[in-house]
Amino acid sequence: MLKLFSAFRKNKIWDFNGGIHPPEMKTQSNGTPLRQVPLAQRFVIPLKQHIGAEGELCVSVGDKVLRGQPLTRGRGKMLPVHAPTSGTVTAIAPHSTAHPSALAELSVIIDADGEDCWIPRDGWADYRTRSREELIERIHQFGVAGLGGAGFPTGVKLQGGGDKIETLIINAAECEPYITADDRLMQDCAAQVVEGIRILAHILQPREILIGIEDNKPQAISMLRAVLADSNDISLRVIPTKYPSGGAKQLTYILTGKQVPHGGRSSDIGVLMQNVGTAYAVKRAVIDGEPITERVVTLTGEAIARPGNVWARLGTPVRHLLNDARFCPSADQMVIMGGPLMGFTLPWLDVPVVKITNCLLAPSANELGEPQEEQSCIRCSACADACPADLLPQQLYWFSKGQQHDKATTHNIADCIECGACAWVCPSNIPLVQYFRQEKAEIAAIRQEEKRAAEAKARFEARQARLEREKAARLERHKSAAVQPAAKDKDAIAAALARVKEKQAQATQPIVIKAGERPDNSAIIAAREARKAQARAKQAELQQTNDAATVADPRKTAVEAAIARAKARKLEQQQANAEPEEQVDPRKAAVEAAIARAKARKLEQQQANAEPEEQVDPRKAAIEAAIARAKARKLEQQQANAEPEEQVDPRKAAVEAAIARAKARKLEQQQANAVPEEQVDPRKAAVEAAIARAKARKLEQQQTNAEPEEQVDPRKAAVAAAIARAQAKKAAQQKVVNED
């Protein structure tokens, strides 16, 4: 009695909350043995057929490949893919793949040559002599992934289990309607499946090995029991049919009574699960030396005249498989990859078969019924009762629809296994799984963006820290260089100090004069003369700098005078050759005369302030005075020949004459009161005298040509002329005295 009770406890099974019992529809395809499908003409092999990054390409367009030859390299979590047959690589380009949106992914396109030649195969029949690491590496490099639907790399999963796995579970439940791939594989290849299970057990060394299978597969159960008749290390557990008992968390709870923690993995509780198809692929990779190039696919549905399970090469177009099964599409025919609850509709039939493709369902219009219109949620809680993960689908629906990502995360949307039980029982025909998939994808995108932002922030902070360290190091180097001079600098400083000390010693050395000898003062005298010369040079340099800033260069002055003379000659020639009707405007001539007088005064001031050694030649000054008188006479002639209507106003001329007389008196007073040592410059006096005579003549000419009714008093004009002549004579006498 105790033994019976112990046996009952040993084979105990648990039941999970929720679940549904939809029509199984498995008899359409599980009654015929596995069969081969003729090779397609073209194969499309996506580089990514698993969870993780795609591998690195190791083939090029035009390469000849054999069946089983790697097309990519598997490093880390990157799983390689292999050629499904022999042929030629014709293209490497994006192609639509097995995805609800038919996303394009990079794929290798191979045209088959029809020979189907294998690469040399090296099987490990003695796998028990191999180490755990060698077996895991072989499984990984041969491209084995989870064939139950997740597509997680098997080698990575085994490596992560380590030594903490106590229970190895083989998932043979295959609970979704229509799918019979695992059922037929266990019926036809039970021995190979068990051999693969033993290889996994050899790697993990678990305490117990459990095979969970639903009771709706009697033929498969019989075949497994026959193979395990003489084995005590593997236990076969038959469980009630209930959807979704094939889920990883649900089957773990059914067989062990343990629940996977929220956000955790089954390995956290000492459990590792593998699919039946994965165990078979492990056997072929290790013992037969064959990479995964094909898998069992169920072809079913009322639109298929020849349903069943076939060995489909990876990369085979779906259209090719359906045509081989005598596909009879209707007007609005749909094809579902996967089961009716967890699968997705293909947008077109050129999508290739991949490692996670377990079923192609082509139902008729009567089989699935008319599509129902989505209605509003009535909060009946039927979805919550059917959820096997103990979630609240109606709340998740509202959060997903309202883009409330934080609340959806708080309500554990990540624990949803997308089994479709909630959508199956929903009376409002709401496609809840579609909302949940979209919400999970958006949350994943947000987290990925946050991760990238955090990485960018970390890189920025690291860069700032590096720049600060470099700046501190640079300042430290500069500080060290300033405090501690280099060896060259030290030598130069020492040499300079030595020279200074030597000079000081020579300067302080006493001079000894012997009797009868004269002291030698030549060195002292030379040093004194050198200092004086240096002082004079500095003073001269300073004086030249000041003169350059205030006084014009005498040579420049001479050049300007020559330019002025050239301009005067040019003007005379132009006037001499001018036509009578183009006489010079008297006002313009007066302006030019004033400009000439201003230039003459400027030149006189510059010459008067020049250094004594740079005095202008008196003869040159006399020549310039003569030029000025000639210009004055010329201006008088121009004014005399001017048109009568443009004559100067006599009153204005009288005013100018009075101003000239006042200036003459002022000049006489300045000359009379001047100190002898400050005599007027003879050149300046000569120029002023010439200017005065020119003004006098100009006034006489203006008065002579004035209109009769506006004539100035002749006596007054005569007096002014006499005064001007007297001033000129006085200036000439003063010039003679200064020259003496």
Swiss-Prot record:
Q: Major location, coarse class?
A: membrane
Cite the binding residues for [4Fe-4S] cluster 1.
C377, C380, C383, C426
Q: What EC class is this?
A: translocase
Q: Which PROSITE patterns match?
A: 4FE4S_FER_1, 4FE4S_FER_2
Q: What GO cellular component is one of the record's annotations?
A: plasma membrane
Q: What is its EC number?
A: 7.-.-.-
**InterPro entries in alphabetical order:** 4Fe4S_Fe-S-bd, 4Fe4S_Fe_S_CS, Ion_transpt_RnfC/RsxC, Nuo51_FMN-bd, Nuo51_FMN-bd_sf, RnfC_N, Soluble_ligand-bd
One GO-annotated biological process of the protein: electron transport chain
UniProt binding sites for [4Fe-4S] cluster 2: C387, C416, C419, C422
Q: Where is this region: Disordered?
A: 627-652, 694-718
Cellular localization per UniProt? Cell inner membrane
Family, according to the entry, reads as follows:
Belongs to the 4Fe4S bacterial-type ferredoxin family. RnfC subfamily.
Q: What is this protein for, i.e. what is its function? A: Part of a membrane-bound complex that couples electron transfer with translocation of ions across the membrane. Required to maintain the reduced state of SoxR.
Query: What interactions and quaternary structure are annotated?
Result: The complex is composed of six subunits: RsxA, RsxB, RsxC, RsxD, RsxE and RsxG.
What is the name listed in the Swiss-Prot or TrEMBL entry for this protein? Ion-translocating oxidoreductase complex subunit C
Primary gene name: rsxC
